[in-house]
Regions:
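Nucleotide-sugar-dependent
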Residues: 230, 272-281, 286-307, 312-325
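A charged, aromatic-enriched C-terminal amphipathic alpha-helix characteristic of glycosyltransferases
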Residues: 338-374
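N-terminal subdomain of nucleotide-sugar transferases
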Residues: 1-59, 237-240
Length: 374
């Protein structure tokens, strides 16, 4: 029997943590066992200590996968200083484990969080010579500008990260706009440029199924991280009459949004992944946002489970970004506020959304892309 090659997955976030990145990397790890001996270098079991593990979480990690964990960082990640220090220390800890374990003949798949780890892994790849695949969820330092962060020495950081990205064997973008940005990012850095592939996130079409839309007023819903780049304050300021806005999740901007005291905005707090079907079905239309300037710098993974729930999308964000193209090309919602709200039209858009999730964005279809790419 032929010995399988080792694939190392390097990520701060990994199950049983329930962030979207953890969920994605856990499923990718399970899929890859059919081709590799999979080993994981990751952070602690829970990213946010305020959250509890979900006893109803059905995710099971393949028993053959070896997981090496580093200790967590006890800083407030909702502050800029706390997040920066957490990124630095977590990167150092993950790098130390990688340096001690990864061999030249191995393959590596890492995700771009925490950002400093990209620089360290580029250095390690240059030293050891393993095959380095980078799954790009966020593009640093470009993503600091839309977040309103004034990064000192921005030009120097961009040069260093552009060069680091160019050392990869493959960059995996999660959208067409991101592939465009990555191509520009590495174009002047290296003669042997990395391959750029596009592998979108997937929809949980088995765990999430369409339910009847609620009675009464049209309910607009946001479910996910309430961060600086989501621009939810603008949504609240522009909320049309007779539309309710329900927000699920937590994040750095949660308290400031609550202080707006809008009478038709309701906060429901965090939810478990096992509750997604109930949460995503409790609306007529779901909102996906990206801050101005975020073209190609991130693709909200929540989009695909919204499709699975059979709900249309109202999208606010850069034109020609992946979600903008998806909504307009497939007629599954609106880019900007609609001129009128029609429940029958929302139902038809929702049906198209579910059909699209089943045909193009099933887990099986997306995992086959990962297996072929790496």
């Amino acid at each position: 029997m032929e010995n399988k090659q080792i694939l190392w997955i390097v990520t701060e976030l990994f199950p049983p943590d329930e962030t979207s990145t953890a969920y994605i990397l856990g499923e990718v790890a399970n899929a890859m066992v059919q081709k590799y001996v999979v080993k994981v270098i990751c952070g602690p079991e829970i990213y946010d200590k305020r959250k509890k593990l979900d006893e109803k979480n059905k995710f099971k990690l393949d028993a053959s996968i070896e997981v090496l964990r580093v200790e967590g960082i006890d800083f407030d990640k909702n502050t800029t200083k706390g997040k920066a220090l957490s990124f630095l220390l977590m990167s150092k800890r993950l790098y130390s484990l990688a340096k001690s374990n990864i061999k030249k003949e191995d393959k590596v798949l890492m995700v771009t969080n925490p950002a400093p780890l990209v620089l360290l892994m580029a250095r390690l790849k240059r030293k050891i010579g393993f095959e380095w695949n980078v799954l790009v969820h966020d593009v640093f330092p470009e993503n600091t500008k839309p977040a309103g962060l004034n990064l000192p020495l921005y030009g120097l950081f961009k040069h260093l990260f552009d060069k680091a990205y160019s050392k990869a064997d493959q960059l995996i973008a999660i959208g067409r706009d991101m592939a465009d940005v990555l191509g520009n990012k590495i174009k002047d850095c290296s003669k042997n440029k990395p391959k750029i592939s596009i592998i979108e996130n997937w929809a949980d079409i088995e765990g999430i199924t369409p339910q009847s839309m609620p009675e009464g007023n049209i309910v607009l819903e946001y479910a996910g991280n309430i961060g600086r780049v989501q621009g939810l304050n603008k949504v609240i300021e522009q909320l049309p009459e007779n539309i309710e806005f329900h927000i699920y999740g937590t994040g750095a901007m949660e308290e400031s949004l609550k202080k707006m005291n809008h009478p038709r905005v309701f906060f429901h707090g965090p939810y478990f992944r096992s509750q997604q079907n109930e949460v995503l079905s409790d609306c007529h239309i779901a909102i996906v946002t990206l801050q101005d300037g975020m073209y190609g710098l991130g693709v909200p993974s929540k989009t695909y489970n919204i499709l699975a729930a059979g709900r249309p999308i109202v999208y606010f964000g850069p034109k020609n970004s992946e979600i903008d193209l998806l909504v307009r090309e497939k007629q599954i919602g609106y880019c900007g506020w609609p001129l009128k709200w029609d429940k029958e039209e929302l139902v038809e858009m929702g049906k198209r959304a579910r059909a699209l999730a089943e045909s193009d964005y099933s887990e099986e279809a997306i995992m086959s892309k990962f297996i072929q790419a790496i």
